[in-house]
């Protein structure tokens, strides 16, 4: 192998290793910020990872909203019409949050039937439903 070819091969291998390292770092950083979506049925089945930031979506069950006498703590149940989980949240709820409303909550699973939310998102107009919730609920209705 000539010195010129050897140098070109070395430069190519070095550039490839630098690009691979950069891609690995980007993928690692993205993995830390991923917030996966689960339904109440998947959480009850134990498919959602514990101590990992996730999203859960469904409909707020009727007569399930319990507000604390003092403070902003609230507890409610969400359902996908197959299973129900209890969500606890401490903070200001969206103005459009109510029973029978489609919501997405972000937070962590505490056990198979309880979810601690750090953020609650409600629909913003009469025709909107989060795409993940809509498809998950449509799948449950078809079954």
Curated annotation (Swiss-Prot):
Q: Where are the Periplasmic topological domains?
A: 30-143
GO cellular component, alphabetical, reads:
plasma membrane
Reading the lineage from the top rank, the first entry is Bacteria
Q: List GO BP terms, alphabetically.
A: cytochrome complex assembly
Sites where the protein binds heme? 124, 128
* Localization: Cell inner membrane
Cytoplasmic side residue ranges read 1-8
Name one molecular function that GO assigns to this entry: heme binding
Its record classes its membrane topology as: Single-pass type II membrane protein
- Gene3D superfamilies according to UniProt: Nucleic acid-binding proteins
Predominant location: membrane
> Which key words are in the record?
Cell inner membrane, Cell membrane, Cytochrome c-type biogenesis, Heme, Iron, Membrane, Metal-binding, Signal-anchor, Transmembrane, Transmembrane helix
Q: Which InterPro entries match?
A: CcmE, CcmE-like_sf, NA-bd_OB-fold
**What sections of the protein cross the membrane?**
9-29
Tell me the protein family, please: Belongs to the CcmE/CycJ family.
Q: What does this protein do?
A: Heme chaperone required for the biogenesis of c-type cytochromes. Transiently binds heme delivered by CcmC and transfers the heme to apo-cytochromes in a process facilitated by CcmF and CcmH.
Which NCBIfam families does the record associate with it?
Answer: PRK13254.1-1, PRK13254.1-3, PRK13254.1-5
Q: Which named protein is this? A: Cytochrome c-type biogenesis protein CcmE
Which species is this record about? Legionella pneumophila (strain Lens)
């Amino acid at each position: 192998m000539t010195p010129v070819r050897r140098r070109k091969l070395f430069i190519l291998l070095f550039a490839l290793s630098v690009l691979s390292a950069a891609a690995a770092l980007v993928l690692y950083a993205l993995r830390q910020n991923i917030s996966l979506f689960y339904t109440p049925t998947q959480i009850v089945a134990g498919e959602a990872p514990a101590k990992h930031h996730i999203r859960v979506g469904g409909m707020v069950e009727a007569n399930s909203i319990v507000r604390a006498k003092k403070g902003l703590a609230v507890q409610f149940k969400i359902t996908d019409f197959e299973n129900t989980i209890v969500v606890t949240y401490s903070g200001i709820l969206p103005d459009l949050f109510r029973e029978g409303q489609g919501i997405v909550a972000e937070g962590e699973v505490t056990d198979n039937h309880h979810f601690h939310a750090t953020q609650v998102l409600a629909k913003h107009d009469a025709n909107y439903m989060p795409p993940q919730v809509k498809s998950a609920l449509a799948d449950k209705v078809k079954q």
